[in-house]
UniProtKB/Swiss-Prot annotation:
Glycosylation sites: 43
Organismal lineage: Eukaryota, Metazoa, Chordata, Craniata, Vertebrata
Listed name of the protein: CD59 glycoprotein
GO CC entries: plasma membrane; side of membrane
Self-association state and partner proteins as the record states: Interacts with T-cell surface antigen CD2.
Any single biological process term in GO: negative regulation of activation of membrane attack complex
Amino acid sequence: MGIQGGSVLFGLLLILAVFCHSGHSLQCYSCPYSTARCTTTTNCTSNLDSCLIAKAGLRVYYRCWKFEDCTFRQLSNQLSENELKYHCCRENLCNFNGILENGGTTLSKKTVLLLVTPFLAAAWSLHP
């Protein structure tokens, strides 16, 4: 195979790579401010690598979310909620309504303050 044959082969491989790209993206339920079961699905963008379900009172949020931002602080700020029960997961359609009954994380700002206060007191007592 000469130079021309190698170039043709390379070109074909490049075209195959472009057209056969799997482009797999995570699929999540997405119904912001929903109070009922969510049945609308969406394909998440590449920077949103997890599905979120968060419950605050009667409001239930379903959406794509960045996994590293799945913390009480981030969720509380973004959703403007003071108390949340939430769950982030990384499988297709894993943020279904019943998942919070089986687990999830419930925190409020008061709980976070109660958890942090002993550590602050200990650090303060160690400081001369």
